A protein has these predicted regions:
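ATP-dependent carboxylate-amine ligase
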Residues: 1-163, 365-375, 379-517
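Transmembrane-cytosolic junction motif
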Residues: 154-184
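Walker A (P-loop) phosphate-binding motif
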Residues: 175-222
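Short catalytic-loop micro-motif centered on adjacent basic/acidic residues
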Residues: 190, 215-217, 239-243, 298-299, ...
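Flexible active-site lid/hinge loop adjacent to a nucleotide/diphosphate
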Residues: 223, 234-307, 350, 422, ...
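Acidic, Mg2+-coordinating active-site environments of NTP-dependent enzymes
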Residues: 266-400, 425, 450-458, 467-485
Length: 517
């Protein structure tokens, strides 16, 4: 009977572990497999707290029942109760919906199986030793219960142990990608910046298609492995456009070494990822590394971008290679005059906002220097489609929705509010605030609140604690407190849209936090 109970305990314990570690695996994946992602993730902390609270509650009951008769039977009853509690947790975890669900990639499967093996060893060894020592079943069940306190830590340890192998494995993919790049030998263009990378990449790809067969990295796959995946699709392409992402010092240098681009675009620099860069000076230094190319260098003419020889600047200043001296934005799009080289074009686009016009001009400058005619560039700009979630105008009945949920920086937020200002009717802003701004996060969100107060008629805030600086900024800016609505989740806010929105309203959805916030 004791051995049958122990066997059942091992099976049920391992199955329970396999299901209940999902939040920790998810937090790890969302943080780029940084072990700290398990513990820092704000949406997965409740899982750790719930498990710990459940274990402590049952341990207290277990200790109290030690003094009753037939405690072995009571132990089995308590174990059954605990099993039902875990079953409830499993169902709860399975039902939870996420914007980016946990993906069981090859790496995740390896980590998952490794963590299960470690837990099975801990549980099996402990139960085996206790059985061999004649420890009664009551305490064996208690030991199995206490092992649940190790769930998150086992995932963390598994990740640390697996890291050297994963680095070697990643290096293999990167090396294969580098070799394929050498073999295919396309024109390689690198694009980086604190904002606008994906937009400029997509706009440039559309312009270059008039002359070249183009492959660009997908979505925001801007890490070495993302590059490797994209390079795997190279098939007699003339041009490869690589979007470079950077969260810390050294990231751009690593990608430059991998891709060895011929040409580069620097879209702009602002205070972003300061939690991992630690200072704006580090951001500036790292982003400028993309301009270490022998070919065409294009950069936005902004305060944080240095004036360097051989760089073609894009902006609104005299002396810029590509200059915009008039921008008119409306609900139907943007009109602007573009001076490039010694030519002038009067252009119209369906894209909204000054920042999108600047992104078009950055792409146009590179395309022009790579042999795309001004007529083709004009045609591409006229027919350019908005990129999803980047100030995309969506009509929902009589309500205009400006979807800018992929915007997460102060400059982009200001541009989006300037676009909102151009719309007629009541103006509403929905936001959870901005993240990854380091020590400046509170002050920047406070300023965002003041800027919203100057434009909007109603504010919908997601998360009371996180948006407190925005709330304070709104009040400081003279905003009507009765027009501020706070919800803990975006889903709850959406369920109240029928009461919050009316015909003729324009709703700006500014930023959307990832699942680990």
């Amino acid at each position: 009977m004791r051995y049958l109970t122990a066997s059942l305990l091992l099976v049920l314990g391992v199955v329970s572990f396999a299901f209940l570690i999902k939040p920790y695996l998810h937090g790890l994946q969302l943080s780029g497999y940084k072990t700290s992602g398990i513990y820092k993730s704000k949406k997965f902390k409740p899982s750790i707290c719930f498990q710990t609270g459940t274990v402590i509650s049952f341990v207290i009951v277990w200790v109290l029942f030690y003094f009753v008769l037939n405690r072995e039977i009571w132990g089995l009853i308590l174990a059954l109760g605990y099993l039902l509690t875990n079953l409830f947790s499993v169902v709860k975890v399975a039902k939870k919906k996420y914007k980016k669900p946990l993906k069981f990639t090859k790496r995740m499967i390896r980590l998952f199986l490794f963590a299960i093996a470690i837990y099975a060893a801990i549980l099996g060894l402990g139960v085996g030793l206790m059985l061999g020592s004649g420890v009664e079943t009551y305490f064996i069940l208690l030991y199995a219960l206490l092992t649940e306190l190790t769930y998150a830590h086992i995932v963390a340890v598994s990740n640390v142990i697996a890291l050297p192998f994963e680095k070697l494995n990643n290096r293999r993919y990167v090396l294969a990608a580098k070799n394929k790049l050498i073999k295919e030998n396309p024109i390689k263009i690198a694009i980086t910046g604190s904002y606008g990378k994906t937009s400029v990449k997509n706009y440039l790809a559309e312009m270059l298609k008039y002359k070249y067969k183009v492959l660009a990295t997908k979505a925001s796959f801007n890490t070495p492995l993302g590059m490797a995946m994209a390079i795997g699709e190279l098939d007699c392409h003339d041009v490869f456009i690589a979007e470079f992402g950077a969260r810390k010092t050294g990231d751009i240098a690593e990608l430059m070494n991998m891709i060895k681009p011929d040409h580069a675009i620097l879209t702009g620099i602002t205070a972003q990822h300061l939690e991992t860069f630690y200072s704006i000076e580090n951001v500036i230094e790292e982003k400028h590394k993309v301009l270490n190319v022998d070919g065409i260098k294009v950069a936005a003419d902004t305060d944080m971008i240095r004036k360097l020889d051989g760089v073609l600047y894009v902006g609104k200043n005299d002396g810029d290679f590509c200059k915009c001296d008039l921008i008119e934005s409306s609900e139907s799009g943007s009109r602007f005059i573009m001076h490039i080289d010694e030519s002038t074009l009067v252009l119209k686009t369906a894209l909204l906002g000054e920042h999108n016009v600047m992104n078009l001009m950055l792409a146009a400058t590179m395309a022009y220097k790579l042999g795309i005619s001004l007529g083709e560039i004009e045609d591409a700009i006229i027919n350019m489609k908005p990129i999803p979630h980047r100030l995309e105008l969506i009509k929902s009945g009589n309500v205009n929705i400006l979807d800018d949920t992929f915007n997460c920086n102060p400059q982009g937020a200001e541009c989006a509010l300037n676009v909102l200002k151009e719309f007629d009717g009541r103006k509403i802003v929905l936001t959870p605030g901005m993240i990854e701004l380091g020590d400046a996060e509170k002050s920047e969100n406070y300023l965002l609140g003041r800027k919203i107060a100057a434009v909007a008629d109603r504010a919908i805030l997601i998360g009371a604690n996180r948006t407190k600086p925005i709330y304070e900024g709104l009040i400081s800016g003279g905003f009507n407190e009765r027009e501020i609505f706070i919800f803990e989740t975006l889903e709850k806010a959406k369920s109240n849209f029928s009461a919050l929105l009316g015909g003729g309203d324009t709703l700006l959805m500014l930023n959307d936090l990832p699942d680990n916030y």
